[in-house]
């Protein structure tokens, strides 16, 4: 298994970029401590996404689309286009040493 990071290396409210199957990905640790992983590409036009800790949302700066952090669903998008598809979630596992890995079914 390929370790992504140890839990102590990512603060609550922080995020970390990593590569997943040749694509940009993001690991988010919410202020509550939840660990969430997503392909870091907006489903609209492939723009980069970023975690915005202040608003507790994932943001695509290209058209200011917002995605729910808990499930990657579309929260808000521009009225200029239709966006029905949310972000692709990546399942994660944490071992007894607090190392974070891709879950078996994500590999």
Report each predicted region and the residues it spans.
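Active-site glycine-rich loops that stabilize anionic/oxyanionic intermediates
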Residues: 45-47, 63-66
């Amino acid at each position: 298994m390929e370790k992504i990071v140890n839990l102590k290396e990512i603060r609550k409210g922080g995020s970390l970029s990593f590569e997943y199957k040749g694509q940009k990905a993001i690991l988010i640790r919410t202020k509550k401590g939840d660990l969430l992983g997503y392909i870091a590409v907006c489903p609209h036009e492939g723009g980069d996404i970023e975690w915005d800790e202040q608003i507790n949302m994932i943001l695509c700066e290209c058209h200011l689309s917002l995605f729910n952090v808990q499930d990657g669903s579309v929260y808000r998008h521009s009225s200029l286009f239709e966006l029905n598809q949310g972000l692709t979630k990546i399942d994660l596992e944490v071992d007894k040493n607090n190392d974070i890995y891709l879950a078996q079914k994500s590999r």
